């Protein structure tokens, strides 16, 4: 990740609109800040959410609430719970997220 020169700024997430994205099951709600080439998001997965696609984009994901499950294309499964963080590079490991109980995530990509 290349973070270009960017003056100090703060954001109040309460002012960022929410976008609803349907999954294979359930839905995700995104709040998005685009800062040059860096996307910063608060994402909430509903209970019983499952992504409708495999993702090959790199992310840094921190779980703020709940639990998220990640299925990797090679068959591995990883669980991310409150206070945990994961990272994956662009084109590294195709992955697909789901959540049984719902979760709230802070994501940088």
PLM feature segments, named:
Residues 74-91:
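Short acidic-glycine-tyrosine-enriched beta hairpin
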Residues 36-55, 89-92:
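Conserved short histidine dyad/triad with adjacent acidic residue
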Residues 50-55, 72, 97-98:
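Short histidine-centered beta-strand/loop micro-motifs
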Residues 50, 67-71, 85:
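Short beta-strand segments in beta-sandwich/barrel cores
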Residues 54-70:
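Short, conserved beta-strand element in jelly-roll/cupin
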Residues 90-109:
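Ligand-binding loop in jelly-roll beta-barrel domains
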Residues 1-41:
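A short, N-terminal "cap"/entry segment at the start of jelly-roll beta-barrel domains
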